[in-house]
Each structure stands twice: as C-alpha cells, then as structure tokens.
Amino acid sequence: MSKKNPWQIFSEECKGVADAYQRLMSEANFGGVLDEKTRLLIMVGIYSTTRDPVALSHFVGEALKAGASKRQIQAAALLPFTVGVSSAELSIPLIKEICDIERR
C-alpha cells in the first residue's frame, strides 16, 4: 500500500480538480477570515459529523501541524456529539491514534 495519504494521491492524479477545491475552500473562508487552526478544527467537527475516517484523519493531522492540541481537536470532534454518539465513537479513538503516532 502507498505511504501517501489519499489526498496526496488525489492531488497528483487530479491536480486541476484538487487545485479548484483548494480555491473553493479559500473563497468559502472569505480569503482567510478564519485563522488556519480554527478552520482546521471546524473541518474536524464537520468530518466527525459525517463519519468520514479518511477526511477526519487528514484534518486531524493538519490541525496538529497548525498547532492545535489534542484536547482542542477532541473538543472540535465532540461538538457534533449532540446529534449522535456515533460521531464521538469514531472520532475520539481516531484522534488518539493519530496523536500517539505524531508523538513518536
């Protein structure tokens, strides 16, 4: 299996689409009104809600790189908890695993 994450592979295989997505995300953030860490924490909350482990893993890693703490990421993932426990059941173990790997 490739050591590249799915986004890296997608970006290489579909560069134009990936670039268009990045531009769309920038516009959705009105050119950067949210700082990067905040934006990434929101993405963690979104993908926790949709129970998408691939995207959630990506954004947890990106949030860590942007300076978010494990607790901040967990808090973002738990916000959707009010719409159902299944989002937390997916998110918290995944966050723990990624944070444990990042510490190595």
Please tell me what each predicted stretch does.
Residues 39-53:
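Amphipathic, charged-and-aliphatic alpha-helical interface segments
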Residues 49, 57-59, 85, 98:
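Hydrophobic alpha-helical segments
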Residues 9, 33, 55, 80-82:
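Residue-level preference for alpha-helix termini and adjacent loops
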Residues 1-40, 61-65, 88-104:
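Acidic, glycine/proline-rich low-complexity segments that act as flexible tails and inter-domain linkers
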Residues 71-99:
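C-terminal structural segments of small proteins and small subunits
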Residues 51-77:
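Mid-chain, well-packed structural core segment of small domains
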